[in-house]
């Protein structure tokens, strides 16, 4: 009998072996994942094939992005027009691609970070999103800043907000960003265990607390899907701290959560969720930085599972 995870309208089964690769190609690990309007799945990796493309069933279609990125690719977002935004905190850029692999734009001075905590773009940016109503680009910046930056769709700088701290409108680590159809901007503030909501100018609206190290986030229909990272140093192996998926309505009410208390590579288990996507059927794809969190510390180091699919089950 198949095992089903979740509750009510949000019930899922693990898809064994989704995303098998051709001989000689490996993920290493997957910091991001996104799905286009045709249910093609784009997986961001830290291997030699930075952006891999699969069909919905998990058949490998090819890759692109070689020579464009460092080994610290970080966030992947797909916009309403199917363009892809890729954050690379190793070279301090946000790059925009078409789904055929053509680079369309690059924001940031490659390999020239701004002053750490200085507030100027960019110092290790984490993610970017596009506002559908006007095409503006919102960037979470990230590891060396506690800041949100806004650009026009043509790449002209507009304004920024945020500073280090725990008050409303401040961030410890803005790790992911999304924009809904009402122009509300959602920012994952990972180390504060919360998601903050803003208007397009950066005015604070509200915050949702008690979300364990939210790392990944995607809007789909009238819900937000969140991947939660494991515990921090000293409690990083504690059961029940993160390594799970949570689903919220747009008022911040949790409607579903799944993920075993113990981390792992089995069905229903996660190690380090870092990217999340949902296709037109409601199936969930979870990308993980399992090598960074666990695999590189093993003796000898080894690659761990870093992409998985959960198929939505009809009630």
Spans of model-derived segments:
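Eukaryotic scaffold repeat domains enriched in small/polar residues
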Residues: 1-315
